[in-house]
Amino acid sequence: SSDVCSSDLVRGWLEVKGWAYKDFGTNSAASVDYPDYAHPLALAVESGECYPGIAICGSGNGINMTLNKHQGIRAALCWNAEIAHLARQHNDANILVMPGRFISTEEADMILTEFFSTQFEGGRHQNRIDKIPVK
């Protein structure tokens, strides 16, 4: 429906900002397997081809879990602007995941704005991030 977050909304938001982006799909209403889209996105962010990444899924959980299987990825499931702010400020999230079925277009706009305008704080948060990879 028109009141939920969609990839069209995100593409439009990025275009209004004048930012280049790479669209990994999906571009249809057909049911798809989220790992088929999560892995290429994660690889692009890990390699530096894209930064940051944005993913939208029904609840956001499945694609978020898949993205976070990649060592260099810190995907954050954000359903409001405050969560998006903290994901960037404290966790240096490099992929924003939004639960498309559960947020409105207005909420998505606020989340995107907050995620892209917040800088990583570093300091004690960097020490914690350094402990994330399994060694």
Q: Which residue ranges define each predicted feature?
A:
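A short beta-strand-loop structural module common to alpha/beta enzyme folds
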Residues: W19-S31
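A general structural signal for well-ordered alpha-helical segments in protein cores
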Residues: S7, A38, I63-N64, A84, ...
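Charged helix-capping and loop-helix junction motifs
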Residues: P35-H39, W79-N80
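Mid-chain, well-packed structural core segment of small domains
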Residues: A55-R101
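Short, glycine-/small-residue-rich phosphate/pyrophosphate-handling segment
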Residues: A81-N127
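Short, small-residue-biased leader/transition segments that mark boundaries at the very start
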Residues: S1-S6
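Short, structured active-site "lid" loops
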Residues: Y37-S59
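Short helix-loop-beta junction
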Residues: G12-A20
